[in-house]
Amino acid sequence: MAQQTPLYEQHTLCGARMVDFHGWMMPLHYGSQIDEHHAVRTDAGMFDVSHMTIVDLRGSRTREFLRYLLANDVAKLTKSGKALYSGMLNASGGVIDDLIVYYFTEDLFRLVVNSATREKDLSWITQHAEPFGIEITVRDDLSMIAVQGPNAQAKAATLFNDAQRQAVEGMKPFFGVQAGDLFIATTGYTGEAGYEIALPNEKAADFWRALVEAGVKPCGLGARDTLRLEAGMNLYGQEMDETISPLAANMGWTIAWEPADRDFIGREALEVQREHGTEKLVGLVMTEKGVLRNELPVRFTDAQGNQHEGIITSGTFSPTLGYSIALARVPEGIGETAIVQIRNREMPVKVTKPVFVRNGKAVA
């Protein structure tokens, strides 16, 4: 039996089509995925992300532990509330999960991890935390709502009290603050400004209804996927998994190589991969009729005349741009064009950076 978030009843009241998503009943859409997508790009939309796992870590050696656990370096986190995106790697350099870590105090940090990887993440974290004496608290008492779009912060702020409005005033991206019952973070998965708000389960439904009344459109998993793909954001299990290096998933920027003497899980394997080269993640654009889909082969000939093949990891029709886009993992040496096999047709595609839309505007 699939689990339900505290907002399940609100989704059904809003007319959602519910689907099983990694063991959770979640809204796919509320009538029109396209309308929901455009609401986030032009105004304000919201997503129930309560299926994600919030984990609080306490102990005097928490920073030391996270410097070992994660490929990015929490030594960068010096201001309370600052957040960092990182891969959590296995010994062979594969990605166990990608996550966000928040620094509150020297003995309190918070992780937000994916729902699909919850059990293995908690097992891995618990196993490696033991020698550091870390107290691990899974915050199943909290729900989370992502409010995203150019007007999202202003509309959400109408629900805040004076102290909460003051707490978030001027807050830069990738920060979080606890203000009363709300943990408000300037993070998201859409390429738009907004907040991700964690709050007690029993208060989630009232907060959701108030956001609807404030003019924020409920959005489902369908729009969440097209928005994140336009923004060039990875989805665990597609762009990366335990067999794929972060270097092959456009996550090289999240690896803190310096200081060179910091030992983190997977470092040795990554250094070998960096030296010998890996595949890389690129963007693909197809303006001709048709849709680029996951797992389609991508073929190209390099400058030396050698033929290579890669694979589309995520593909869709872009509602913002009006044509098909994809992320693809390909060998090094790809040029500005490639061929994608769609059924029995060879379709030309343009190779771009793996990001297509930011703040409502085309990047590619």
From Swiss-Prot:
Source species, domain of life: Bacteria
SS bond partners: none
Chemical reaction(s) catalysed: N(6)-[(R)-S(8)-aminomethyldihydrolipoyl]-L-lysyl-[protein] + (6S)-5,6,7,8-tetrahydrofolate = N(6)-[(R)-dihydrolipoyl]-L-lysyl-[protein] + (6R)-5,10-methylene-5,6,7,8-tetrahydrofolate + NH4(+)
GO annotation, biological process: glycine decarboxylation via glycine cleavage system
Gene Ontology CC annotations of this record: cytosol; glycine cleavage complex
Keyword Transferase set for record: yes
GO molecular function: aminomethyltransferase activity; transaminase activity
Keywords: Aminotransferase, Transferase
Name of one Pfam family that matches: GCV_T_C
Keyword Ribonucleoprotein: no
EC number: 2.1.2.10
HAMAP family xref list: GcvT
Recorded family membership: Belongs to the GcvT family.
Quaternary structure, from the entry: The glycine cleavage system is composed of four proteins: P, T, L and H.
Function: The glycine cleavage system catalyzes the degradation of glycine.
Name recorded for this polypeptide: Aminomethyltransferase
Organism annotation: Shigella boydii serotype 18 (strain CDC 3083-94 / BS512)
